[in-house]
């Protein structure tokens, strides 16, 4: 797996690359560090990107933002300057409301092109007896993309007051629920997950994330990716 990821980074400048970003949980800043490093140091012009759960927000930001190198800017423009800690128990609903409000405000009045190569995976729970994974690759506008990205990371009764999040006549929950991770050997595929560079996260609190801890995770993701690529390009 790690060799496949490393080789895909080696060919990144010229080859078509599939970027798959799985559920992140509290490790979303680590993913953003990886993506920020790639976007700055190994820009990809020809790619498809798929986001699942927290990876949906990562995918959205990757396609809409030119620069992902500043952690504090990313935190402030999504979560907000007024929030310094994210807690799964106390304020996750408010955090999600802030993300939706801030992103829709940021992109309002701007002709942001919805990338044709972005896909978001969520879990359709419209029929309780047939819960299924659903992929959407076409969006009406930026708000539509934001809405479905938030569906993909919706945890029943934790992310909001209801079991599911409503979207276009359907009800959805976290995309990771029904998505099966697949070991990928394609050298042109980047599969982002917290263990991709073999970093030890055993001391992390999975229910609480401060802005300073988020900064550390972002730097870990950036530096881990840089180290791997330094070895490759020598």
PLM region spans:
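Catalytic nucleophile serine of serine hydrolases
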Residues: 53
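Residues forming the Rossmann-fold NAD(P)(H) cofactor-binding site
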Residues: 56
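Classical Sec-dependent N-terminal signal peptides that target proteins to the secretory pathway
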Residues: 1-15
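Patatin-like phospholipase
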Residues: 12-50, 60-234
